[in-house]
Design a protein with these regions (language model features):
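Nucleotide-activated sugar donor-binding and catalytic core shared by glycosyltransferases
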Residues: 1-236, 241-373
Length: 373
């Protein structure tokens, strides 16, 4: 009898990292792969599913306008019980730190279904930064039986927390697997035509804890540097959150060196990252993606759960203070040595075989842990 492996995810970042795993698991004859999406993000989730040709078996469709964390939590918990009871999976795989991940793991705990946590062990140890993600992933870490840590540092965190080392597997990050299928040398886009021979600055900003004054500080710093550097052109695919859009309009509106565009598909996002001069972000996943292309990343957050990149030199944590962001952004444009030191640092996040390692583990096969250079 085939082992039933159910994957549950609901947001764009989860889908980017889980869809390659879905496709890998479906190649394994000993496994039956079932996909359930919660629809925590709707439009942005569907874009990724289409890119990787993944068709969900179940869709909870929980998203509604103006949804709160309470809405997401109760919506998933109420709807996923019936799916789990119908499928009766042998293991449920969740990813990272979203509300979908936390609530699904909680439902599995209530039904005593084993949980596999993909991208386990990331920590800031401040449950309000990032919020609510840090709490979510710590809570899932208590429940999970399989812990697929992307790096040695993530695995070490789990060991310090008392997890059984025999249930911790260092796999690399599945996002590196995803990028092997999305980046194209012959890629074209109207925004790249607009940038031309200039330096592309790729921007993302959306974090819940940065809403309000921190985001205004971030945008003001970016605009100041762009105003001083005519060789730079910035592209910012803006998040759907109306609070983010209002802040961007107030601080970046009318700046002819930045194009604020609607959310782009993962295929476009990865190709923009591969072609940028540098990236400013408060995203989690982009901290892993952009270093793979040898591009510096300024992380506009006070904490990061990805210290490997900071240690390796590919990431620089700059917080949300306007002057600090301005100074660091300006330095990377004006100091070639500083730029090269970040651009040439090694990528500590994976080799593109994380999904195969996870599949091997679920099949009970021997696996070779991922070891960074």
């Amino acid at each position: 009898m085939k082992k039933k492996v159910m994957l549950v995810f609901g947001t764009r970042p989860e889908a980017i990292k889980m869809c390659p795993l879905v496709n890998e698991l479906k190649t394994r004859e000993s496994l039956q792969t079932i996909v359930c999406v919660t629809g925590q993000h709707r439009q942005m989730l569907d874009q990724v599913l289409n890119t990787f040709n993944v068709v969900p078996d179940y869709d909870l469709s929980i998203m509604k306008q103006g949804q709160t964390l309470f809405d997401i939590t109760t919506g998933i918990l109420e709807r996923i019980k019936a799916v789990l009871e119908e499928v009766k999976p042998d293991v449920v795989l969740v990813h990272g730190d979203t509300s979908t991940t936390f609530v699904t793991a909680l439902a599995c705990f209530y039904l005593q279904i084993p949980v596999g946590h993909v991208e386990a062990g990331l920590r800031t140890y401040n449950i309000y930064s990032p919020y609510p993600e840090e709490f979510n992933r710590q809570a899932v870490g208590i429940i999970s039986q399989y812990n697929f840590a992307p790096t040695q540092m993530a695995a070490d965190n789990l060991v310090r927390e008392g997890k059984d080392p025999s249930k911790i597997y260092i796999t690399g990050n599945t996002v590196i697997d995803a990028m092997q299928h999305t980046v194209r040398e012959d890629y074209t886009h109207p925004e790249l035509d607009w940038v031309g021979d200039g330096k592309l600055i790729f921007i993302t900003a959306h974090r819940r804890e940065n809403l309000g004054e921190p985001m205004h500080h971030m945008f003001r710093a970016i605009r100041r540097v762009l105003d001083e550097h005519p060789e730079c052109k910035a592209v910012y695919p803006i998040h759907m959150n109306p609070v983010v859009r209002k802040a961007a309009d107030e601080e970046l509106g009318g700046c002819d060196r930045i194009h604020i565009i609607e959310p782009i598909e993962v295929f476009d996002c990865h190709n923009f990252e591969a072609r940028c001069h540098l990236c400013l972000t408060d995203s989690g996943g982009i901290q892993e993606e952009v270093p793979s292309y040898g591009r510096p990343v300024l992380v506009m957050r006070d904490t990061t759960e990805r210290p490997e990149g900071v240690k390796a030199g590919t990431l620089r944590l700059v917080g949300t203070d306007e002057e600090v962001i301005y100074k660091n952004f300006k330095e990377l444009l004006e100091n070639q040595d500083a730029y090269d030191a970040m651009a040439k640092a090694c990528n500590p996040y994976g080799d593109g075989h994380a999904c195969a390692r996870i599949a091997d583990i679920l099949e009970g096969k021997e696996y070779q842990p991922w070891v960074a250079e």
